From Swiss-Prot:
The name this protein goes by in its record: Phosphoribosylformylglycinamidine synthase subunit PurL
SUPFAM superfamilies, per database record: FGAM synthase PurL, linker domain, PurM C-terminal domain-like, PurM N-terminal domain-like
Catalytic activity: N(2)-formyl-N(1)-(5-phospho-beta-D-ribosyl)glycinamide + L-glutamine + ATP + H2O = 2-formamido-N(1)-(5-O-phospho-beta-D-ribosyl)acetamidine + L-glutamate + ADP + phosphate + H(+)
Gene that encodes the chain: purL
UniProt keyword list: ATP-binding, Cytoplasm, Ligase, Magnesium, Metal-binding, Nucleotide-binding, Purine biosynthesis
Organism, as annotated: Lacticaseibacillus casei
Keyword Lyase: no
Length: 740
């Protein structure tokens, strides 16, 4: 239960130092006082605690984020606004962003996940885009533990409950399991929107005398100081603090979304800027809008719609009540905008104005309760240049894992049941993937695909994180995660356009954790430049620790690609017997960090291979060219579990088996060498396909009998499709005590 905030005098704040509990250091308090020219009062110190948090100021991560490559010929708007925007031709643009809601979901899984969905949707429609798809990336602890099972059930319910109710399809995602996430689950949500590229909106408040209009849910005491809550380590006591978690209302969000899209689409002459009230609530949205326009601003807090009595200025400004937006509207157009919101039965009020100068002023009950420079809460927030230190695990010599396989069919069956590999349909079937009727490829293939209405084109989209790689090679995890997402899009027939990211790491004040963050970013940068697909949006979620124990470093990549012709959409499933099976790319004995290593040892050890970006580019360009020439009937990237796992997955939907003959040791069928694809080609297209002279080797053919017959250099074995599929489909429901 939330404890009502008790205001303190500036003198009491200076001596009792309550700001320490809000995430500010003594040095930061002194610096803020210097910037504003007086001892901060209760409201002002609250605003600083929110705006100077890592969640809002990126004070530890900004030096890393500034190195990202964020522009190319397609990018219309990059990081810094609610979401990034990319030109997709024909007057249209795609808008997308991912956000994390990790800490709230650990405390209150249903509402934490639901409000994470709501927040990222608002980011998209604040740009003027209609949200058309949701994706997620989830990470949980040991699935055998009841607490993990509870988190899985409630987080999935929260995502589905909000997305289904608002009418946006959840079309893709991933779910991973590892003990490092037992106390700190990861909930990363991504939203994609489509818009006319000449209607892009920004979050700015410019023009002296222009009005600030608040619209949406009334402000309450939920989620107060949530930005600071998300910018610190967890303890067991804090894990029980549900007052820091917001409560969402998807039906209110639907009204708010439709009303805002009407404003951005049909009342552009009235609108100066628009922004979601997300982390740090009203203070963040308002002061950021003023900062971007180099303006001053005054707000009357008595005019803020409130659902609870006697709220203090601290509470009003730092509440993170959901489903709220702030608009800057040109003088003389206020009633036009208010009338639109009235049509949707939304609470809306003029709560302030843009003023001359650069001060940020708040009035409450006729009293000036905040008078600080806008820059003191935005541009002048501290930036810390940390020095990283290589973790001991990376500096120490480590032996390569060399698996021994005596019963390949049993190993294959067990691999299909590994929590990270196993079928997740029992989870994603709780999401509506087809609302809006644009979804062409449903969850379960390499990437989701939605059509772009009014055209012959489509968008492919996917998410992925790579925690295990980061344990073994810090820079490689960002690289591998990026490349894996690109392969997913290419296998669907799409050219990657750009990415959004969520960088989920531990405490950045610890040199080893900061090293992991910085090195992962370097890997992402290298891949974005090599493939001309920049970072256009994202967020950082640090302090993912409980009682000093951190999660695995986990960069999450969300990627969107363009399919020029609907007829070239490709899925992973076998299509017909007698199609030829080709393996693209070389296979090596890469078992360190693999699912096979986890199965046989329960550990993740060893060093990872180096990445060959040029070879990866060659493979992806070859596959995309073959797909665009209509030579490929099915395509699947090889990742978790390697060749044999991918082969089985391709057979399940059509109930088709395969015969393959590979010049590899049996164990290498489970190797996780990167940069590989499995392709199927109809016999009549064999000559045309091989005439492309790509890095592809014919290894077998699809067969009608539901058996996988495999010949390696040292063994011949046969596995029943039914046996593999049963293991694949029943593993997760069994753990969750569900019926398959």
């Amino acid at each position: 239960m939330y404890v009502v905030h008790v205001e303190m005098s500036p003198e009491a704040i200076a001596t009792q130092k309550p700001y320490l509990d809000l995430g500010l250091t003594e040095a930061e308090y002194d610096r803020f006082a210097e910037l504003i020219g007086h001892q901060p009062n209760d409201t002002e110190i609250g605003l600083a605690s929110g705006m100077w948090s890592e969640h809002c100021a990126y004070k530890y991560s900004k030096p890393v984020l500034r190195q990202f490559w964020t522009k190319n010929e397609r990018v219309l708007m990059g990081p810094g606004e609610g979401a990034g925007v990319i030109d997709i031709g024909e007057g249209k643009a795609v808008v997308f962003k991912a956000e994390s809601h990790n800490h709230p979901s650990a405390v209150e899984p249903y509402e934490g996940a639901a409000t994470g969905v709501g927040g990222i949707i608002r980011d998209i429609f604040s740009i003027g885009a209609k949200p058309v798809a949701m994706l997620d990336s989830l990470a949980f602890g040991d699935i055998e533990q009841p607490h993990t099972q509870h988190l899985v059930d409630r987080i999935v319910a929260g995502i589905g409950g909000y997305g289904n109710a608002i009418g946006i399809p959840t079309v893709g995602g991933e779910t991973n399991f590892d003990g490092s996430y037992t106390r700190n689950p990861l909930v990363n949500a991504m939203c994609v929107g489509i818009m006319d590229k000449d209607q892009i909106q920004k979050g700015k408040a410019a023009g002296v005398g222009n009005a600030l209009i608040y619209v949406g849910a009334k402000t309450g005491r939920d989620g107060i100081n949530g930005a600071s809550f998300a910018s610190g380590d967890f303890s067991d006591e804090e894990a029980a603090d549900r007052s820091a978690v917001q409560v969402g209302d998807p039906f209110m969000e639907k009204l708010l979304m439709d009303a805002c899209l009407e404003i951005t689409g049909h009342h552009q002459e009235a609108l100066v800027g628009i922004q979601d009230m997300g982390a740090a609530g009203l203070v963040s949205s308002s002061v950021e809008m003023a900062g971007k326009a180099n303006s001053g601003m005054v707000l009357d807090l008595d005019l803020i719609p409130q659902r609870e009595a006697e709220m203090t200025p601290f509470e009003i400004m730092l509440s993170e009540s959901q489903e709220r937006m702030l608009l800057c509207v040109r003088a003389g157009f206020e009633q036009e905008v208010l009338a639109v919101f009235a049509d949707y039965d939304l609470d809306a009020a003029i709560v302030g104005h843009v003023i001359a100068g650069h001060q940020y002023q708040l009035y409450h009950h006729g009293k000036l309760v905040c008078d600080v420079p806008v820059s003191s809460l935005t541009d002048d927030a501290p930036i810390y240049h940390q020095q990283g230190k290589m973790p001991k695990r990376l500096a120490q010599p480590a032996a390569d894992f060399d698996p021994i396989i005596t019963d390949p069919v049993q190993i294959w069956t067990d691999m299909m049941a590994m929590p990270t590999i196993a079928d997740k349909s029992s989870l994603y079937k709780r999401y509506d993937a087809q609302v809006q009727t644009n979804t062409v490829v449903l969850p379960g293939s390499d990437a989701a695909v939605i059509r772009i209405r009014g055209t012959h084109r489509a968008l492919a989209m996917t998410t992925d994180s790579k925690d295990v790689t980061c344990i073994l090679i810090a820079g490689g995890c960002g690289n591998e995660c990026w490349l894996k997402r690109a392969r997913n899009l290419v296998a669907s027939g799409a050219e990657p356009l750009g990415i959004t990211d969520c960088l989920n790491f531990g405490d950045p004040t610890k040199p080893e954790a900061f090293y992991e963050l910085a090195e992962a970013a370097k890997g992402i940068i290298a891949a974005t430049k090599a493939f001309n697909a920049p970072v256009i949006s994202g967020n950082v979620s640090l302090y993912n620790e409980t009682n000093g124990e951190a999660i695995y470093p986990t960069p999450m990549i969300g990627m969107v690609g363009l399919i020029e012709d609907l007829s070239t959409i490709t899925t992973a499933a076998f299509k017909q017997a007698d199609d030829l099976i080709y393996l693209v790319g070389e296979t090596h004995g890469d078992f360190n960090g693999s699912e096979l290593q986890k199965l046989q040892t329960g550990e993740v050890t060893g060093k990872l291979f180096d990445f060959d970006l040029e070879a990866e580019k060659q493979h992806q360009h070859f596959v995309l060219k073959a797909i665009r020439e209509h030579l490929i009937t099915a395509a699947h990237d090889l990742s978790d579990g390697g060749l044999l796992v991918a082969l089985a997955e391709m057979g399940f939907d059509a109930q088709l088996g395969a015969q393959i003959n590979v010049t590899l040791p049996t164990a290498w069928g489970f190797s996780e060498t990167q940069g590989r694809f499995l392709l199927t080609v109809s016999p009549e297209n064999q000559a045309a396909f091989e005439a492309l002279h790509g890095p592809a080797q014919l290894i077998g053919r699809v067969q009608a009998p539901p058996e996988f017959e495999v010949t390696t250099v040292n063994q011949h074995f046969s596995a029943s499709l039914q046996q593999l599929q049963t293991a694949f489909e029943e593993a997760l429901p069994c753990h969750m005590n569900q019926k398959a």
